[in-house]
Amino acid sequence: MEDAMNRVKTIRYDSRKWPGCLLVMLLVLVSVYPGFAQSSGQLTESQHAKFGGPDTVPNRIESERVDKDTLYEFEFLKPYYEWKDEILEKYGYTYALDYYPIYLKASDSLPGTDDDAASAVMRFSGFWQLMGRAEDSKSSGTLVYLVEHRHRYTDNLPGEFALESFGYAGFIGIPFTDDGWHLTNLYWNQEWQNGFGFAAGFLDVTDWVDVWALTSPWTDFYNFVFSIGAATMDLPDDAALGLGVGGWLAETVYLIAGFEDLNSDPTDPFEGFETFFSDHEYFKHIEIGWVTSTRDQYYLDNIHLTLWHADERDEIDVEDGWGAFLSFSHTFAEKWLIFARGGFAEDGGSLLERSVSIGGGFAPGGIGAPGFGHQLGFGVNWGRPNDALFGSDLDDQYTLEAYYRVQVSKEFSITPDIQFLVDPALNPEEDHIWVYGLRARLSF
């Protein structure tokens, strides 16, 4: 069991020891926002916020501009936001500063380990539209960046907590580590009115692969089984050097494809040029999706199929692997969302080789702005640990999770969470574990 844990940590957390590191000319700006394809006027921030996942920098910043569905409104900050709007309108530039602390507590832990963990992440992000701001422009080009500082509050790290402290083959609060300074995004995004685009640079692949509404570990579910690929994809780390393209094939059908360096290291990103061009170890993916409502709601009302392949990594002794993932999500009555998502992996370094998640969400103020507003989320997952990573004959795991995000103000939210983990695969002593969490977000 200890060997399996160390191997998982090597893949996900010790990327700084990989030769080189980092990647991305990433993926998929995928296609251009539909309104962009229909209008030749100057692009606005909200138009930029329509493609990519909820955690892409433009989408996240746009959600922070929403001023409804809050308990309080701080009037004294209005001049500050008006100043930011003026900068955006005049220069095409805007930014956000966010701080995310998290605390986790488990009902039991393995001998010699702690039963709680806490850390925090500071994030500074922004985008600058340098091309296509004229009224008659037929394309736009935008520079996007996201820099983080990840630091611990306790000896245990939330990102490693589930695996190390109670033998659960998975991650809870996956980005909450102690990497220190950490590059997540630095890429160029080009879009055309015909509905196609590309992104190239250092990107977070999870912004563009298997995108759906409640995917964010910063604002939504804590457990990775309710996020990208339901833990069945062998994903690169942040700041992966790669290239992606995408576009709308029809009014309601889109295609995304890309490849990224598997040896990315967000703490030393520019070494990614060496690993990208020398090691040739890539994560490749193609996704076709059908939007069941309007394009600007594509990650809310969506059915998509993602196929992926990860090359063998010689340095860390991980076999090549491949898999498929199918996702369905649908909103109704403006406030409710339901989802059913599942996939499989053959070999590779994914946590699970089979995984199915079902559940829903409820937002009293309406499902819409990603990661913003009061919101209830709940889900159930069945997962089978990956034999190629952990070894054979492990029990299947079952996960139940529920959270409620309280939007205190536009700048501050708090999200309590509870999880019930059944048959943690790497824990021979316990047949179930309770995990309690508290996460906050402060943003300006």
Predicted regions and their residues:
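Short loop/turn motifs that connect adjacent beta-strands in outer-membrane beta-barrel proteins
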Residues: Q38-S40, Y72-Y95, W128-L143, N194-G195, ...
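Outer-membrane beta-barrel architecture
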Residues: D85, S125-F127, Y187-N189, G244, ...
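Outer-membrane beta-barrel "beta-signal"
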Residues: H432-F444
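N-terminal regions that are enriched for targeting/export leaders
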Residues: S39-D108, G112
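Sequence/structural signature of outer-membrane beta-barrel proteins
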Residues: I102-D108, R150-T154, D207, F226-S227, ...
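Surface-exposed coil loops of outer-membrane beta-barrel proteins
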Residues: N156-Y187, W192-F283, E287
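Transmembrane beta-barrel strands of outer-membrane/channel proteins
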Residues: Y95-Y103, L143-H149, F198-F202, A257-D261, ...
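Detector for outer-membrane/organellar transmembrane beta-barrel domains
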Residues: W290-A388, A402
